């Protein structure tokens, strides 16, 4: 799948070097299929790296995707130059009248704070509420998933005994769900978090299904039955080196982190980590784009605002595109 982004985005060169199809404006104008319009709320501190990770996963199907990035104006980002945000990101006030086929809300390293203590919490609440009427399918990652569950259903989060960090084998609980078409019974899934959404409170939300779980991680992927809301408690988007970087960062900050589980060969952090989840990540995001987004939205983009009220789309009946 080609992704179309603003020309000059630093991630473009890295993506092309990795054989990822990135499309410029001129070529995009000659496409005959309707592109999907996706919004990425990037809450991660290393924004350029997260951009590349997300775009890589969006690029692997035959569809064209127009990707826009959103940042929180109520937060001072120390690791990203304002010029980069001005050039390649939009604020909520700039996009709130628009409609999107899909939304991705990333994680953020703020999970040890209460939700209301996060300085951009009010702004994020507005975006989550806005998405109900302006986005067809929303995918939330790690803290972004915990935040959305709290905002929408009042599901609180709780501290884990220690940081859950490493690569864990997760079981596919709903193999017939479209998001898991083509999956094996288990897949490797990066985790990096101190908290979890309260499992007993999740069970009380009748519209949510547990799609994946493991003994070590608990619930790992949830979704509404109509796939309009999807919650990933781990980081399928992570690169091979991301957990290693976080481990070194935590050591430098004096946090005395445990070694990420099932990650470094022979449990030696001097060894290069093995990538064991990339194919599952690519397949999951492709399934999301195809079955939850593309198959559910109308061919004519201007009809999306009317279509958003349809809550019971049958994924066995494809719309004509």
Swiss-Prot record:
GO biological process entries: L-methionine biosynthetic process from homoserine via O-succinyl-L-homoserine and cystathionine
Pathway assigned to this chain's UniProt record: Amino-acid biosynthesis; L-methionine biosynthesis via de novo pathway; O-acetyl-L-homoserine from L-homoserine: step 1/1
Chief site of localization: cytoplasm
Annotated positions for site Important for acyl-CoA specificity: 111
A molecular function (GO) term: homoserine O-succinyltransferase activity
Site (Important for substrate specificity): residue numbering on this chain: 192
Function of the protein: Transfers an acetyl group from acetyl-CoA to L-homoserine, forming acetyl-L-homoserine.
The protein's name in its UniProt record: Homoserine O-acetyltransferase
Species per Swiss-Prot/TrEMBL record: Lactococcus lactis subsp. lactis (strain IL1403)
Lineage summary: Bacteria, Bacillati, Bacillota, Bacilli, Lactobacillales
